[in-house]
């Protein structure tokens, strides 16, 4: 019986080990895609300060964005891919479709928050993006941006603390008090 039971248990356990190795490899590839996307964007932002052509910017921006999209397709239940894409489209998309992409950025940050309701970085960036968008004073975007920054600030997210300290006058004028 022992001779039969041990190989049977080993066969049952083997797929778990194989799946764990596959998942680990998938996770490493996922993180690599996100990192590559951010690296392309960092390089692009530095060169944008030196004013490259719009076509060149969009070509390289698309490559960075594709890295985030590939990461989301690979592991759609992970928050990092949505933060990556939200950051890309929300803050760095240029041209006439910028406002539409900012709204997509808000949706991606919201998706990351739905995956992890305590993801302070997503709250922070959704708040910053909301405040940076053209909006009406007192709009729903305005109110949500204030709530998001407050959540990150009250939970000691360093960037939110710095933002609040630097923009107290703006926040007060926008009825976003701390």
Model-identified regions with their sequence ranges:
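TPR alpha-solenoid repeat register
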Residues: 81, 122, 160-162
């Amino acid at each position: 019986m022992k001779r039969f039971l041990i190989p049977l248990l080993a066969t049952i356990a083997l797929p778990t080990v194989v799946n764990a190795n596959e998942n680990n490899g998938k996770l490493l590839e996922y993180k690599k895609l996100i990192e590559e996307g951010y690296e392309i964007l960092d390089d692009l932002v530095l060169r944008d300060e030196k004013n490259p052509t719009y076509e060149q910017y969009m070509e390289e921006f698309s490559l960075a964005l594709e890295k985030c999209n590939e990461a989301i397709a690979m592991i759609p239940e992970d928050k990092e891919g949505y933060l990556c894409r939200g950051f890309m489209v929300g803050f760095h998309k240029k041209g006439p479709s910028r406002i539409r992409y900012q709204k997509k950025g808000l949706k991606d940050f919201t998706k990351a928050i739905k995956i992890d309701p305590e993801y302070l970085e997503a709250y922070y960036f959704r708040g910053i993006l909301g405040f940076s968008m053209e909006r009406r004073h007192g709009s729903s975007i305005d109110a949500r941006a204030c709530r998001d920054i407050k959540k990150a600030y009250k939970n000691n997210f360093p960037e939110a603390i710095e933002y609040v300290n630097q923009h107290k006058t703006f926040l007060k004028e926008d009825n976003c008090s701390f």
